[in-house]
Amino acid sequence: MNKKPVRVAVTGAAGQIGYALLFRIASGEMLGKDQPVILQLLEVPAEGPQKALNGVMMELDDCAFPLLAGMTAHSDPMAAFKDADYALLVGSRPRGPGMERAELLAVNGAIFIAQGKALNAVASRQVKVLVVGNPANTNAFIAMQSAPDLPRKNFTAMLRLDHNRAVSQIAAKTGQAVADIEKLTVWGNHSPTMYADYRFATAGGQSVAAMINDQAWNANVFLPTVGKRGAAIIEARGLSSAASAANAAIDHMRDWALGSNGRWVTMGIASDGQYGIPKDIVFGFPVTCANGEYQLVQGLALDAFSQQRIQATLAELQAEQDGVRHLL
């Protein structure tokens, strides 16, 4: 039986991440090789980005993807999010030279309030929203608070890039295959304060913590490497990590939509108060996905080091969310 096309809205569609993302969505890598998609693409209403978006759409046409059932270009979120089943909020304002963090939060606050309101007004009531644009956790919080008629659980932030970076570092350290690393998670904010936690992780069924058995490596090498990886890539490439971010967005949405087959993955979700994280803070947690829903992994013990790291990333998130509360 042929499936009915689903509508996938992508913001910042002509940007670097958008360019790395759209072809993979259209080829079926995100929602399955049997699921047709209609792309609803949003860019800012300036001539340059709209022209660039038109060029990207020409290329999408030229791929003749069997699953691409249609696409439209937009400058208004009310049109771009109409009946959207999935929304990937990639576009955000990057921090410019000399820009204060408070200024950055305010500029992005305005963007994500407008997008949250538009989703609230016109998207599918089951829309799955992934915020990629930074600061991702706080932008997801803003969009969620601006969409009171949609369930809180529909809004997520992308921690999967940190998760994948951590998996890759662990695989390299232990000499194991990345596919064999399981039960790793990343707690907190998508920022250098995130806490990548391999205490429960296994590689080929063996304990990763026992294999590595080096707390100094954990604190002084592993965590800084994962936390500062984005900056290291900008330093090396002269541009931010776009392809790996797009790949993480595909992974996040695919697992949410199609299931993670019992594997732990990391998603930024609105807290219900578990693990001592105050309600509604959008925080990286370990989850499993099945039947289009995510389920928090409950009951993990947190040692003193983990508590300290989680409190530090929580404090940063609370400061960010306090910084935008006056906008909401």
UniProtKB/Swiss-Prot annotation:
Question: Any one Gene Ontology biological process term?
Answer: tricarboxylic acid cycle
Q: Where does NAD(+) bind?
A: G12, A13, A14, G15, Q16, I17, G18, N108, Q115, V132, G133, N134
Q: Where is the signal peptide?
A: none
**Residues annotated as transmembrane:** none
Question: Which residues hold substrate?
Answer: R95, R101, N134, R165
Domain of life (superkingdom): Bacteria
Protein keywords: NAD, Oxidoreductase, Tricarboxylic acid cycle
- Name the Gene3D superfamilies for this protein: Lactate dehydrogenase/glycoside hydrolase, family 4, C-terminal, NAD(P)-binding Rossmann-like Domain
Q: What is the catalytic activity of this protein? A: (S)-malate + NAD(+) = oxaloacetate + NADH + H(+)
* GO molecular function (one): L-malate dehydrogenase (NAD+) activity
Q: Where is the active site?
A: H190
| EC assignment | 1.1.1.37
* Entry keyword Membrane: no
Family, according to the entry, reads as follows: Belongs to the LDH/MDH superfamily. MDH type 2 family.
Its function, per the record, reads:
Catalyzes the reversible oxidation of malate to oxaloacetate.
Q: What is this protein called?
A: Malate dehydrogenase
Organism, as annotated = Verminephrobacter eiseniae (strain EF01-2)
The encoding gene is mdh
